[in-house]
Amino acid sequence: MALSDLVLLRWLRDSRHSRKLILFIVFLALLLDNMLLTVVVPIIPSYLYSIKHEKNTTEIQTARPALTASTSESFHSIFSYYNNSTVFTGNATGGLPGGESPKATTTQHTVTNTTVPPDCPSEDKDLLNENVQVGLLFASKATVQLLTNPFIGLLTNRIGYPIPMFAGFCIMFISTVMFAFSSSYAFLLIARSLQGIGSSCSSVAGMGMLASVYTDDEERGNAMGIALGGLAMGVLVGPPFGSVLYEFVGKTAPFLVLAALVLLDGAIQLFVLQPSRVQPESQKGTPLTTLLKDPYILIAAGSICFANMGIAMLEPALPIWMMETMCSRKWQLGVAFLPASISYLIGTNIFGILAHKMGRWLCALLGMIVVGISILCIPFAKNIYGLIAPNFGVGFAIGMVDSSMMPIMGYLVDLRHVSVYGSVYAIADVAFCMGYAIGPSAGGAIAKAIGFPWLMTIIGIIDIVFAPLCFFLRSPPAKEEKMAILMDHNCPIKTKMYTQNNVQPYPVGDDEESESD
């Protein structure tokens, strides 16, 4: 037994420097972060709606206590806004003592409720107002993450990737527990905003860590495709996982399960990454302002932003639109996103490998066009089955864009700047967050003002119009001084021009040459 323990400890010690184990840690962190991101999608609209109408019901009962005894048996049916169901209580007049007839106000209230289909909320104005409220709640996470990313990028350049990665775990655990026990809009908003800080740490540090250990362009693309598969699985599992547990167990259950999984991720990070050790970069990275002036980095970031903005606009608006037009039950609000999540997982895994062969710029261009066309088709759905094909197209196409653009960001830094990746993946995450910040907040307001179909039309056209810009990523030029370094046979980085047919193999030297001024 002691010998087997020693063997296990030796294997774990040797595995600390394994690239595959680091890839697994990043995969798991992105998986859990995006499960928490999307598990709230089917829960929040219905939960906020139930909170509001339970409060209204309590106020009505408090204002008219004298009517309680005389009208408790006069209802033929009672409609519950909490679970969208109608409870039948018996004959409307047979149970009245002394044959008394109900008051006019009570009779009017009963007629109003019984005319509503059992699965459709009747307060259309409340649902329209909820578009804005839910949109702002969803956007708060991305907005905070957007503001935090530049600082995390600079921090990783100074102290390395393990400490920010572990800090992301700690913050995400606190946020998950807050979600579980929050019972008001204000606390939900705080929990969602706090998640943005944790996500910034995990995303920037995780992608930067992968770029630093996978220096070959093809290997880096494959690794990031796998890591984005974790993101895809989180998006895939989150909505149905949340909606099913919410309907059959309660709001707290999905968040407590997630909190337990986050603890497991933290334990693995603590042992493998040793986050107490400061590991600064060996060379000074390119300033963030310089990277932001690079037009090729901006095009890649724009592709990530606008592609993800489509699904970000869907998250708060689609469940509310389904409640209005399809009379959907709570579990259907999350399951509707299942085709997009499955296809995103397929897209990231296929094009993580295929994009390197056919050209990442081409994959991104085609992906942007498919995203736009699929989004334009969503308002034509008449039931949940009509959402399957367009949602599948949206998810698959976003998988094409993300799995192509994430490696290109690292490639552009290798080609045109200093190969330090914290800042460039902060920019990539900023682009992702801008989509998820602008999307829900603007989407909720637009859906309220001009309707859900016009919202889909606007973002669909934007994606299609932006697509041709990806052509400029076909063969981005290298800076002159950087090209001289890349052509050096001692350069540890293997690069590939996407217009070439063959990859020039560069032998890896034992020692890295320091950057010359």
Curated annotation (Swiss-Prot):
- The intrachain disulfides are 120-327
Under the heading SUPFAM superfamilies, the entry gives: MFS general substrate transporter
Which sequence positions carry the modification called Phosphoserine?
Answer: 514, 516
- Where do Low complexity bias regions lie? 105-115
Q: In which tissues is it expressed?
A: Expressed in striata and substantia nigra.
Q: Where found? A: Cytoplasmic vesicle, Secretory vesicle, Synaptic vesicle membrane; Cytoplasmic vesicle, Secretory vesicle membrane; Cell projection, Axon; Cell projection, Dendrite
Observed phenotype of the null mutant: Mice are born at the expected Mendelian rate. The homozygous mutants show severe growth retardation and the majority die shortly after birth.
Which residues does the annotation say bind serotonin? 231, 235, 308, 311, 315, 337, 344, 402, 436
What's a GO biological-process term for it?
neurotransmitter loading into synaptic vesicle
Oligomer status and interactors: Interacts with SLC6A3.
The name on file for this protein is Synaptic vesicular amine transporter
- Give the source species: Mus musculus
Task: State the encoding gene.
Answer: Slc18a2
